[in-house]
Amino acid sequence: MQAVKRSRRHVEEEPTMVEPKTKYDRQLRIWGEVGQAALEEASICLLNCGPTGSEALKNLVLGGVGSITVVDGSKVQFGDLGNNFMVDAKSVGQSKAKSVCAFLQELNDSVNAKFIEENPDTLITTNPSFFSQFTLVIATQLVEDSMLKLDRICRDANVKLVLVRSYGLAGFVRISVKEHPIIDSKPDHFLDDLRLNNPWPELKSFVETIDLNVSEPAAAHKHIPYVVILVKMAEEWAQSHSGNLPSTREEKKEFKDLVKSKMVSTDEDNYKEAIEAAFKVFAPRGISSEVQKLINDSCAEVNSNSSAFWVMVAALKEFVLNEGGGEAPLEGSIPDMTSSTEHYINLQKIYLAKAEADFLVIEERVKNILKKIGRDPSSIPKPTIKSFCKNARKLKLCRYRMVEDEFRNPSVTEIQKYLADEDYSGAMGFYILLRAADRFAANYNKFPGQFDGGMDEDISRLKTTALSLLTDLGCNGSVLPDDLIHEMCRFGASEIHVVSAFVGGIASQEVIKLVTKQFVPMLGTYIFNGIDHKSQLLKL
């Protein structure tokens, strides 16, 4: 009998889709049907549909977002034909919102597309309740005053906000939302939840039925899964080391040598896998510091207004302190490995059974908590709780400062650190100058370098404005490079299509993260520096 590498594919049925969605096949592989459903239920509002906004919304329309509302009070001009693919020569003189909306609708007829011919700045001031109907607002090319007002409005209405700006060869993207919990964070690299150094009774019992010292028949020795090998080796090591596992480099090497010593022949792939996976034995037990911080958060003390996420976190806290014995619920999946079919299936059943048992405990605790706070015990669906349990070790929570707080109460230490850092000084310079440009516009009714003539005067004025802003930020004595100020004036507040497409693409990527509640969105202000070809995140 020959050893074969067993995979989940061989023993698990692939989920079948209720309705084939070949249209979105590629993206379904990334965020799945649950993510796609969230996208199709989302209602997105775009403020200003210049090239930056059009490019951001284009990506979402192609992705199958449920509905879009385009808000812009301007008319299409000849200049728009050179930087916005969502208008054409026939659109000149017509409503920009209407033209862009029509072109976007052509890209995906299943999206519900609407437009409103109104200046976004006016709408923000006169009709703040308008924004409460949306899942998320993408606000492009807004000046500082409008950004601050809109941020307050969206926070009060619990609507997610993404601020986007393209300005010459620079741009920024800034997310603003009170808090954004992520259950399925999809980390690039994460340790398998195998509990090799902390096996539960059923796994222990299974491991004890297999003897590593039996070398005949040779095929049987080659079929022992590495999970079994490592659980046994970890136990053997602990017995001879006062219950401790390898911790130093020398001990870890010694442990691997111990595993290697159990090999009968040099062609045993299962033992090679065990040696490669030995680091999983050295991993610390229990939950991560990040999850610990989450269950210790004041929001985990739930009340009738708590979100489903915090109710489940409260249940997780109880589980970790009781049934879990310091551990989160087991994920229940095992990786591919060299094994006999029988061993692999038995092992898989043991992991799945433990995961199901942990889920049932969490589910019961969720129901009890809901009952205690006066809510319907069945108000959180079973699939949601199951997903929470499966991803309990990977939970993330993003909290964002209000834009007003960032502007009015700046983190002086961080700003000075970025300005002094050769690698980040360009990004910080653009952050300052983008804000200075808005002050400039408020004072002189135009952006620096926006009109022909008077460039030298605009450069001088922008420099003075930037220095004044730096002083207000608590950075007395700090200066920005003259070259950067000159470039900012040369930009003339233009939206260059290639920059708009890039910045708009980044914005739409973050929107998808926020809507699907998968992957971790950016924390901070993303700055695109087209001069130095850099993308950097400023945490202010």
Swiss-Prot record:
Disruption phenotype: Impaired meiotic recombination characterized by a shortage in bivalent formation due to a mislocalization of class I crossovers (COs) and correlated with strong synapsis defects. Dwarf plants, highly branched, with small crinkled leaves, small flowers and short fruits, symptoms of fertility defects. GO terms for cellular component: nucleus. Keywords: Auxin signaling pathway, Nucleotide-binding, Nucleus, Ubl conjugation pathway. Gene3D superfamilies: NAD(P)-binding Rossmann-like Domain. The keyword Nucleus applies. It comes from the Eukaryota. Pathway: Protein modification; protein neddylation. It is found in: Nucleus. One of its GO terms (molecular function) is nucleotide binding. Its main location: nucleus. Expressed in shoot, root and floral meristems, in vascular tissues of cotyledons and mature leaves, and in the stele of the root. Expressed at higher levels on the lower side of an emerging root during germination and at higher levels on the underside of the apical hook. It holds the Pfam family ThiF. The keyword Nucleus applies. Regulatory subunit of the dimeric ECR1-AXR1 E1 enzyme. E1 activates RUB1/NEDD8 by first adenylating its C-terminal glycine residue with ATP, thereafter linking this residue to the side chain of the catalytic cysteine, yielding a RUB1-ECR1 thioester and free AMP. E1 finally transfers RUB1 to the catalytic cysteine of RCE1. Plays an important role in auxin response. Regulates the chromosomal localization of meiotic recombination by crossovers (COs) and subsequent synapsis, probably through the activation of a CRL4 complex. Belongs to the ubiquitin-activating E1 family. ULA1 subfamily. This is NEDD8-activating enzyme E1 regulatory subunit AXR1. It comes from Arabidopsis thaliana.
